[in-house]
Amino acid sequence: MKQSNLLFMSAAMMLASCGGTGGAEQNTALIGKSDIQIEGKRMTPEALWAMGRIGSVAVSPDEKQIAYSVAYYSVPENKSNNELFVMNTDGSNNRQITCDNWQESQPTWIKDGAKIALLCNETGSSQIWEMNPDGTARKQLTQYDGDIEGFSFSPDGKKLLFIAQVKTVQSTADKHPDLPKATGIIVTDLMYKHWDEWVTTAPHPFVADFDGNNISNIQDILDGEPYESPMKPWGGIEQLAWSPSSDKIAYTCRKKTGLAYAISTNSDIYIYDLATKKTENITEENKGYDTNPQYSPDGKYIAWQSMERDGYEADLNRLFIMDLETGEKRFVSRSFESNVDAFLWNKNSQSIYFIGVWHGETQIYNINLADNDRLTQLTDGMYDYASLALCGDKVIAKRHSMSMGDEIYAVNNVRNGDIFAEAKQLTSENKHIYDQLEMGKVEARWMKTTDGKQMLTWVIYPPQFDPNKKYPTLLFCEGGPQSPVSQFWSYRWNFQIMAANDYIIVAPNRRGLPGFGVEWNEAISGDYGGQCMKDYFTAIDEMSKEPFVDKDRLGCVGASFGGFSVYWLAGHHDKRFKAFIAHDGIFNMEMQYLETEEKWFANWDMGGAYWEKDNATAQRTFANSPHLFVDKWDTPILCIHGEKDFRILANQAMAAFDAAVMRGVPAELLIYPDENHWVLKPQNGILWQRTFFEWLDKWLKPAEK
């Protein structure tokens, strides 16, 4: 990666020159939209980090304006900054309404559209503020003692629901006040760590009165309970919902702690009555995940996402509705044999929009509840849609692909026969960067697997691809293990930056991925070293038949389950590959079973504990642990891991690296003391990309060195 190919004109820093009052720091240097200049029309790590990333999207009550947030990153400052924008719903008159160094997020229209509420940390903690739609007249609405992490005003505007952390675990200092400098942590049950934190608090939903200027009478809906709502690590305000009458709150909660929490996905939807303070569990009979409730606009129904089986986090995510008068429940997405990833009621309460993945694309669908739950696909094309908001006769959604990050689109909410709904792009946040880049072609290929099935494989070609040349080629191994290889855009595992470095990328939707029916999705559980690995070999072997693929310069890369795949393939690839890269991968399955914090996942996907000698599924899983095949390792390998990763501990990468070195296999180890399962800090991200390509180039482009 040559630094001379890219010039930072301002390193993602800009002098403020935007609308709105912007707070006290309006005239200081800010992290904002980059004016990066790129030479050579090839994607670079710096170009990726220069891109603005669109976040929350909200439509005004009169459906004339859209408010949204954008995160900007500075590599020199090694941090980000969130700003807010407002535009007309046709995309015109787009203007930035905040311009400061505070973190502003979650724009929400309140007071019939006269004001925008937002989260802002200007006073040192994250509080709720309001301002005019042009950014003027900023005013702080809450002075809560602690950070507010999400919020929602009641439909009548008289109450506020917000999320904040409460202490659930006594610290060592609490137990031993005479030892204030002691650093030891005393643990008595499981779930003491989760994702990337030592668990000492839980998010709780709070409700307060709101008089238009201040909040009062704050009440913790889970007062005295050690449970979390929303659920860690990723749950937000979408896991709670107001009733249209403003007198009830539906919330998602798994009312378990310790070992019971660690082995179960059994969350439920609870309805809290503000008048009686009573709570009702409406999903008690279901044993899997129940999440993300939404009341219908007419208040007659409530909808939510539901998985059937306890402990199976990748179970079919179904859409259910319940008649609030009769209690009757209905599985309304039955005709869609894939996951409902997000949903939204139509204003007439007669249909529901949702997004879901099918055949490697995440599209928008509609379920007509008044017509026997008839399913209609509204959008088409090589894209992934994300997030949904209604705007008159249109749906406002974010959309991305393997060739472009998120932008906001307006989609007609009707389909005319075989003609899919029209989508109009409303934002062009990174057009100034895309205009300087040439993207590689993305192609869909269907390949016949060893068991006679058809597998969708994405192939991404270098820009200015020449079929008369031979290219080094990378097999991409997806994580999850049940995450789709759809039209995703990543700021780390970005296929276009791999293609820009003159690699062909082969990305198969191997066994275990959603979007191809339940049977295909479930085929990986208990079979980590089985058909999914044969699918990988099918993909790379089929592509190796092409004259433009240099089968003597094949690499294999992946993260999480993809990292496990790399470690496993390193002992089974029969000299196909010349270089491996494993990020946050599982090397020793027995240790992973004990080390990972969400035990339900290990129990389900591994089939059980390794000490269950009569459990054939579990024994097959652990017999396929990559560490058992190190004696067959003969190919250079780069191991990457974050030490704050509590899903798969960093000692897995260290052990793999040590084993390779002791075996005499060329190896390199990249460890991040301050990153989790992902790499989130700008300079760490740049280092990741540079190390990634330096390693691949060393072994797959030796003639060029």
Segments from the language model and where they lie:
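Active-site-proximal cap/loop segments of hydrolase catalytic domains
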Residues: 494, 499, 507-705
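Beta-strand-rich domains and repeat architectures in extracellular enzymes and scaffolds
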Residues: 46-82
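Short loop/turn segments that connect beta-strands within beta-propeller blades
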Residues: 88-92, 132-136, 210-213, 273-277, ...
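Short, solvent-exposed loop/turn segments at conserved positions within beta-propeller repeat blades
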Residues: 76-81, 121-126, 197-201, 260-267, ...
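Conserved beta-propeller blade repeats
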Residues: 51-66, 101-117, 138, 145-160, ...
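Cap/lid segment of the alpha/beta-hydrolase catalytic domain
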Residues: 257, 420-421, 427-552, 559, ...
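Predominantly five- to eight-bladed beta-propeller fold
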Residues: 25-31, 82, 165-224, 252-268, ...
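C-terminal motif of bacterial Sec signal peptides marking the signal peptidase cleavage site
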Residues: 16-17
